[in-house]
Amino acid sequence: MWYSDYHVWILPVHERVVRLGLTEKMQKNLGAILHVDLPSVGSLCKEGEVLVILESSKSAIEVLSPVSGEVIDINLDLVDNPQKINEAPEGEGWLAVVRLDQDWDPSNLSLMDEE
């Protein structure tokens, strides 16, 4: 698992396919997640642009995508259960799956450690 400067984790699941989610640290900073606005399956995301909007007990934030590609799956469970992000941000609280528009090369990303 890789951690982007956008506080989004990146988990390769297949060749040129990654799962994305909010880091543990960011979900703690946000407090209770109350609402999630997910992208549409089939939509395109671009590195550094808004992927997801989260509303929490403390604020609303735009979560930026650390990669570019096509959204091929979203976590629909979050629509009715946004608290899954708080309960398991690096597990069942994942946000989206993206098919990358280029080969996976983490050295091209701006990365940080888990903290």
Curated annotation (Swiss-Prot):
The UniProt record lists the keyword NAD: no
Keywords, alphabetical: Lipoyl
GO CC list: cytosol; glycine cleavage complex
UniProt entry tagged with the keyword Transcription: no
One Pfam entry name: GCV_H
UniProt record, GO biological process: glycine decarboxylation via glycine cleavage system
Segment forming the signal sequence: none
CC cofactor: (R)-lipoate
Record's cofactor remark: Binds 1 lipoyl cofactor covalently.
Residues bearing PTM N6-lipoyllysine: 58
SUPFAM superfamilies: Single hybrid motif
Domain Lipoyl-binding as annotated: residue spans: 17-99
Family: Belongs to the GcvH family.
Name of the protein in question: Glycine cleavage system H-like protein
Organism: Chlamydia pneumoniae (Chlamydophila pneumoniae)
